Each structure stands twice: as C-alpha cells, then as structure tokens.
Amino acid sequence: MAFYEQSVAIFRTVAEPAPASPVGAGMTATRYPLLANPHIRLSGPVDQLMYTNFRQQLDACPEEGTIVIALTTLGGDPEVARTMADDIRLLDEHDGREILFLGKVAVYSAGATFMAAFPVGRRFLTRHTRLMIHERKISKTITLDGPLRMVVASIKAALHEVEHSIEIEEEGFRAIVKDSQVDFEELREKAPSNWYIEAEQARDLGLVLDVI
C-alpha cells in the first residue's frame, strides 16, 4: 500500500495519555471490562479471508449478551468491509444485540468503513491507535476502439462506475461522522490527502465514545 511506510512510522509514535472521557448513554464504566476480552478478533487485510474468519467467530459467539469486535487493519477491500458491516446491522436490527467496536493500533481505510457500521456510542479505540480515512481510488484504462456509438457507451459506463463509487463513498463518510463534531464537508475535504486521526483526537471529535 502507498501509505505502508508512513503507517509503520506512525505505529512507533508514543502519545501522552489522555484524560478519561465521560461515558455516553447505555454504557457505564462497569461494562468497560468487556472490551478487555473481545469475542471476535480480526487482524490483517480486509479481504475474503477476513470475512470468512469474521463469520466463523460470529457464529461461535454466545446467543445472548453484548458482542465485542476488535479490529486491526491497514485497509483492504471496501466491499468486504461493507458486507461485514451489513451483517452487524442485521444482527442489531433483528436480534437486538448490542455490538461494540474496538479499534486497536490501526484502523485504516476499509477498517474505517467497517467502523462506520457502529453508532458513535459503541465505538472504542485503544490508546495510541490511529484512524485513517481516505477517498476510494480507481485505476482503469479505457480503450476506445470501434463504432462511435459503442465508444460513447464505453465512456458513459466508466463514468457511471465512478459516479456510483462516489455515492457509496459519501454514504460511508456520512455514517462515520454521524452524531460527531465532524462535519461531512470537512471529512470530504480532508479525505483526498489521507486523514490520520489519533485515538484521543477521535474521541475529542466525537468519532468514538472513548479511548481505553
């Protein structure tokens, strides 16, 4: 990944401990110990292998009670992240399960897409963790060869693909900043240059509930 070397450098940075923040509605300090032993632990690229691992661990979770999902990733396939997020949404809506997100060390790119599936009141980060949010990228070569009408159709198809990807991206951006102090336009402005956010800053901006 283009940002891999920068990521390694960031991991070595040691930040000053931040003061504890108040706990939001539905969560109390006595429930924080749940985060020390996540039911689901995911680490590595967000891909089909992670999704298979995610499903296996999710199926093995207790049938009742809160579920904690810990994630460490430098990114991956955003569509896999959206699929995992949809599984969380369905479990929450149909079974009424409380599912908490715990980001550890790095929650980059597709990892932030997955985090967006959780409301702010259910998002946590460990100390010194970084979020990284950026725009989707595309690499595509269009070959114009054939009757003019077919060439126009090929160009339009490529344009529609880009426009649809932007719509999906903006849906994710809105979900990430919902109920936070970050404005959608601010995120959209910072995303093209890869926005790195330290855990304490993410908490202060209301992007996560707390840092543990």
Predicted regions and their residues:
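Terminal-region recognition feature
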Residues: 1-212
